[in-house]
Amino acid sequence: MVSTPELKKYMDKKILLNINGSRKVAGILRGYDIFLNVVLDDAMEINGEDPANNHQLGLQTVIRGNSIISLEALDAI
């Protein structure tokens, strides 16, 4: 039996995802499922230290769970 990830404390908070290909995506967590697929609002791909290199992904973005390496809270929990 598959259990649901415990991400309730991250809901409606800004998070940073490290995903495959050494990419980073930041956004507000709006939803998730048992496979760790996540829905982010105002998602942005982070490219290095310079904010000018960041790329807006859209108002709502779905990231597949199998591509997520780690998740980090950017807002206080």
From Swiss-Prot:
Ranges for domain Sm: 2-77
Cell compartment(s), UniProt: Nucleus; Cytoplasm
Cellular component GO terms held in the UniProt record: catalytic step 2 spliceosome; commitment complex; cytoplasm; nucleus; precatalytic spliceosome; SMN-Sm protein complex; spliceosomal complex; spliceosomal tri-snRNP complex
Disulfide bonds: none
One GO term of the biological process aspect: 7-methylguanosine cap hypermethylation
One Pfam entry name: LSM
MF annotations from Gene Ontology: RNA binding
SMART domains named in the record: Sm
Alphabetic keyword roster: Cytoplasm, mRNA processing, mRNA splicing, Nucleus, Ribonucleoprotein, RNA-binding, Spliceosome
Note: Present with 1400 molecules/cell in log phase SD medium.
Subunit comment: Component of the Sm core complex, present in spliceosomal snRNP U1, U2, U4/U6 and U5. The core complex contains SMB1, SMD1, SMD2, SMD3, SME1, SMX3 and SMX2 (Sm proteins B, D1, D2, D3, E, F and G, respectively), and is probably a heptameric ring structure. SMX2 specifically interacts with SME1.
Function comment: Plays a role in pre-mRNA splicing as a core component of the spliceosomal U1, U2, U4 and U5 small nuclear ribonucleoproteins (snRNPs), the building blocks of the spliceosome.
Family: Belongs to the snRNP Sm proteins family.
Name of the molecule in the record: Small nuclear ribonucleoprotein G
Biological classification of the source: Eukaryota, Fungi, Dikarya, Ascomycota, Saccharomycotina
